Each structure stands twice: as structure tokens, then as C-alpha cells.
């Protein structure tokens, strides 16, 4: 371990020694090797990060919107210049295929930052006349210091999705990356500093355990929490934020999304969409369409088409250019996914392909799970009810449109949904009845910077991306002006 780099915290534009005396390791899930050791933040370090953020935010908010925009655009340029380097690090840390991280993760994160850099100058209030001698106007002001808590599946993309609107609106952000995949968030902090962001405007405090998240959610200075993660943790974060200082929250939580294949769907297109909706990023996407509803009349042909495509998935070393399916992000998560697969078998679902761990050759060293497709599924099975967050597709048959809509909505989640059909009227009719915040027709998975994303029900609160998200990072001040005499009743 002598050649393993030790990473400090990133506070006030530089790396600083953590005061906890504790460390944790980042593990390469492709082979189980330690790739980095990270110092863990203490409560004292959180206080230092908050004070730093307060100082930096005052400087940042005092800049013109155009100045802030230019700095954020410089960060975009640096991200794109360093795309391949960052993608390699993301692949080492997450296990995601380099063919994916190099074309999606940094690229889409930079797109979101560029989008909000352009919107920084568009934040404005309004002026409304009340009568000849009086009017009021509004100002949209930054919240101040906000915190982001990231998930492990899209580390740098999530850090950018959270920081971009926050910084564009004039806030400072303290970001806690997942302890499983913390490395690229630290690189992002370096890039922000290089681009000219004032010290303290983006601080990174990493650590294992729940204490850091709790210190952030309960801190009286922090005005907002943006969290991405599981439902149960999200509920605790939200309760803690409300119980401390009534903080604003954005919650991007779990999903168990339905993909409805209609009777008139092009079978090849439907199978392509289903495979992408389940096995992209090794199945570790919160919006995955893991409940695939297929008409009974087309079930056999659809299952055959899906299996043919799954056989073409290239599992292997995530750094290899031809690999498009890497390991899961951690060994504990692999065990969780495998337990769900065993549950599916025990509850009577039929394995069409996959169904276990990948152990061929070098794959045995990593957290690899075979792309798995279950048929003969019922709505009551655990693999259909619960979020697995892995490469597990459940195929369910249906007979009528009314039936499939009811079953698709029969879940506590409401993150995403999709419909595949050649009848555009049917597509809209179904989608308008589905209880989900992100919906796709004849496609799946794209989340452009301009599109607000977020869930219904227990899948989340608030939105990320799009114009509406800027409102989550500002507050409105109303000012009335009287030009005439003031008449008192006393």
C-alpha cells in the first residue's frame, strides 16, 4: 500500500489535512485492489468547511452574473480538456466501462454546467405597478451556503448536477461524495479552483458512515440539502433537515420504473430499449425500466429478442475499449444484487439468461454480476417490488391497457416510466395516466441539461436540471416602494 495515494479534504481552494485521524479506502471493483486512501472529515472539519463557504459565498455573490458565468464556462472547458483523464479515474473508482464514462459521465456533467453558466445572467426579478404612486419589485437572491450529498453510481455527474445550478445562482456548496466513489469530486474541486472560483465556494468533505451527512443536514448555517440516494436514507435526511432549521431539500431517490411495450410496438426497437433500460451502466441507474410489461400475444417473441441482445453484451475489463458492461461498483452491493436474484429463483421466476455471478477468468476477482433476465414474474415478487439497482430485468405479461396502467402505478416509487408504441395517441394516453416524474416515449434514459428530472411519490422531492431548478437555489425578496404620501390611520 506504500504507492497508494492518500487524499485529503478540499477546503478553501486547497487540500487540507483532516482532523479525525481516520481514513478509508477506495476499492477498484474490477479486481478488489485498493486504488486510494482517503482521510475522513470530522465535525471540526465540517465547521471549517462551513466558515470557508460563508467567506467564499460573499465574494462569489458580489460578482456580477456575467463574471460568474465566465468562470463556470472556464470550468466547462477544463472538464472537456481533461475528459479522458477523468473518465479513467471514474472507471477505476466505479467499475463502469471506460467506453461509457468517456462518452457520457463527464460529457453530460459538463453540458449541465455549461447550461447553467448560460443561465447565470438570466436570474431576474419582476416589477409590478400597484397604482400611480406605488409599485413593488422582486429580487431572486442566493440561499447562501448549501450542501450536496452524492450517490456512488454517477459521482462526477451528480456533483456537477448539484453544484452547477447552485453556483450559477450565487451560492457556495459543500459537497459530500459517496465514500464508495469519492475521487472525481475532488478533481472537480481542483478544476473549479483552476477556473477561478473563489476559495470556499466549492468544498469537498468525504467520509464513511452517516455522521458527515448528519452534520451537514443539521448545521444551522446551511440553507439547503440536495441529496441523491436511497429512499430510507432520504427520509432521514429530510427529517433531519426539517428538524434543524427547516432547510429546503431536493431529494432524488429510488425507482422501480415500468417500461410498457404495446401490442403494435416494433419488436426490435422494443427489445433494444428494454436492454438499454436495464443493463446500461451495469444496471446501476435509478431510472432503469426494470419492470418490463409485454402483451401476452407478443411475449415469446419479445423474450427471444431480448435474450439475443443480452448475449451480445461484452463483459470484461472496464478499461478495455470493447467492454460495454463492467462490474458493480462494490462487492457488498454485488452480494445484495445476487441475493435478489436468488430470491427471484426461489419465488418462481424463470431465468432466461444470466442468473448469477460472472466468474470466468479474471472476472472472478471483481464484483461482476451477469446480465439477468427473469420471465414468469408476478407483481408480488421481491424482484418486481423492490429496487435492486443492478442488472436484473423482470418481464411481466398483461392483456389490456387499463390493466397495465393500474399495475405500472402499483408501487411506492414514481421516478420514471416509458412506453413503446407506433400509435402516438396511445403513447400520450398511457403516459398521462402514469404516476412518474420522468417519462419516455419510444426511447429511454436520456436526461438532457434542459429537462427537469425528479420523481413522484417516494422517488423524490424537487427537480434537478432545467430552468425550474434555479428556483430551488434562490429565494424571492419582495420590495414595495411608495412614491406618494403615506397615510397613517393613527
From Swiss-Prot:
Recorded protein name is Betaine aldehyde dehydrogenase
Enzyme Commission designation: 1.2.1.8
Organism whose genome encodes this protein: Acinetobacter baumannii (strain ACICU)
Protein family (similarity comment): Belongs to the aldehyde dehydrogenase family.
Q: Where is the active site?
A: 162 (charge relay system), 252 (proton acceptor), 286 (nucleophile), 464 (charge relay system)
| Complex formation | Dimer of dimers.
Which residues are listed for NAD(+) binding in this entry?
A: 150-152, 176-179, 230-233, 254, 286, 387
Alphabetized SUPFAM superfamilies for the sequence: ALDH-like (SSF53720)
Give the source's domain of life in one word: Bacteria
GO BP term, example: glycine betaine biosynthetic process from choline
Feature type site, description Seems to be a necessary countercharge to the potassium cations = 248
Amino acid at each position: 500500500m506504500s504507492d497508494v495515494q492518500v487524499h485529503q479534504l478540499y477546503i478553501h481552494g486547497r487540500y487540507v489535512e483532516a482532523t479525525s485521524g481516520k481514513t478509508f479506502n477506495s476499492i477498484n471493483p474490477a479486481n478488489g485492489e485498493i486504488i486510494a486512501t482517503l482521510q475522513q472529515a470530522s465535525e471540526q472539519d465540517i465547521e471549517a468547511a462551513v466558515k470557508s463557504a460563508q467567506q467564499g459565498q460573499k465574494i462569489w455573490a458580489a460578482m456580477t452574473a456575467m463574471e460568474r458565468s465566465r468562470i463556470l464556462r472556464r470550468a466547462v472547458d477544463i472538464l472537456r480538456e481533461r475528459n479522458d483523464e477523468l473518465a479513467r479515474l471514474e472507471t477505476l473508482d466505479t467499475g463502469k466501462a471506460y467506453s461509457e464514462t468517456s462518452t457520457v459521465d463527464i460529457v453530460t456533467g459538463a453540458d449541465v454546467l455549461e447550461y447553467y453558466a448560460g443561465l447565470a445572467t438570466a436570474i431576474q426579478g419582476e416589477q409590478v405597478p400597484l397604482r400611480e404612486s406605488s409599485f413593488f419589485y422582486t429580487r431572486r437572491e442566493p440561499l447562501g451556503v448549501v450542501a450536496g450529498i452524492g450517490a456512488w453510481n454517477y459521482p462526477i455527474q451528480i456533483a456537477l448536477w448539484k453544484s452547477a445550478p447552485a453556483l450559477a445562482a450565487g451560492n457556495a456548496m459543500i459537497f459530500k461524495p459517496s465514500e464508495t466513489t469519492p475521487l472525481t469530486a475532488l478533481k472537480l474541486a481542483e478544476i473549479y479552483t483552476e477556473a477561478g472560483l473563489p476559495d470556499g465556494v466549492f468544498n469537498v468533505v468525504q467520509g464513511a458512515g452517516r455522521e458527515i451527512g448528519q452534520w451537514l443536514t443539521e448545521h444551522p448555517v446551511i440553507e439547503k440539502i440536495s441529496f441523491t440516494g436511497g429512499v430510507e436514507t432520504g427520509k432521514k435526511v429530510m427529517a433531519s433537515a426539517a428538524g434543524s432549521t427547516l432547510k429546503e431539500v431536493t431529494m432524488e431517490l429510488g425507482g422501480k420504473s415500468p417500461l410498457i411495450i404495446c401490442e403494435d410496438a416494433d419488436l426490435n426497437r422494443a427489445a433494444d430499449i428494454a436492454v438499454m433500460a436495464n443493463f446500461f451502466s451495469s444496471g446501476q441507474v435509478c431510472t432503469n425500466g426494470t419492470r418490463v410489461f409485454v402483451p401476452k400475444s407478443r411475449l415469446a417473441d419479445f423474450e427471444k429478442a431480448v435474450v439475443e441482445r443480452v448475449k451480445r453484451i461484452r463483459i470484461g475489463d472496464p478499461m478495455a475499449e470493447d467492454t460495454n458492461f463492467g462490474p458493480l461498483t462494490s462487492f457488498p452491493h454485488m452480494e445484495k444484487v445476487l441475493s435478489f436474484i436468488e430470491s427471484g429463483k426461489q419465488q418462481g421466476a424463470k431465468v432466461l439468461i444470466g442468473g448469477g455471478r460472472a466468474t470466468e477468468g479474471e472476472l472472478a476477482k471483481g464484483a461482476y454480476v451477469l446480465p439477468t433476465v427473469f420471465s414468469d414474474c408476478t407483481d408480488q415478487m421481491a424482484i418486481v417490488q423492490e429496487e435492486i439497482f443492478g442488472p436484473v430485468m423482470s418481464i411481466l405479461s398483461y392483456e389490456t391497457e387499463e390493466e397495465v396502467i393500474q399495475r405500472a402505478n402499483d408501487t411506492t416509487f414514481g421516478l420514471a416510466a416509458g412506453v413503446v408504441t407506433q400509435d402516438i395517441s396511445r403513447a400520450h394516453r398511457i403516459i398521462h395516466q402514469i404516476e412518474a416524474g420522468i417519462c419516455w416515449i419510444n426511447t429511454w434514459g436520456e436526461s438532457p441539461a434542459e429537462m427537469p428530472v425528479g420523481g413522484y411519490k417516494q422517488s423524490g422531492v424537487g427537480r434537478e436540471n432545467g430552468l425550474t431548478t434555479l428556483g430551488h437555489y434562490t429565494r424571492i425578496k419582495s420590495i414595495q416602494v411608495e412614491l406618494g404620501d403615506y397615510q397613517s390611520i393613527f
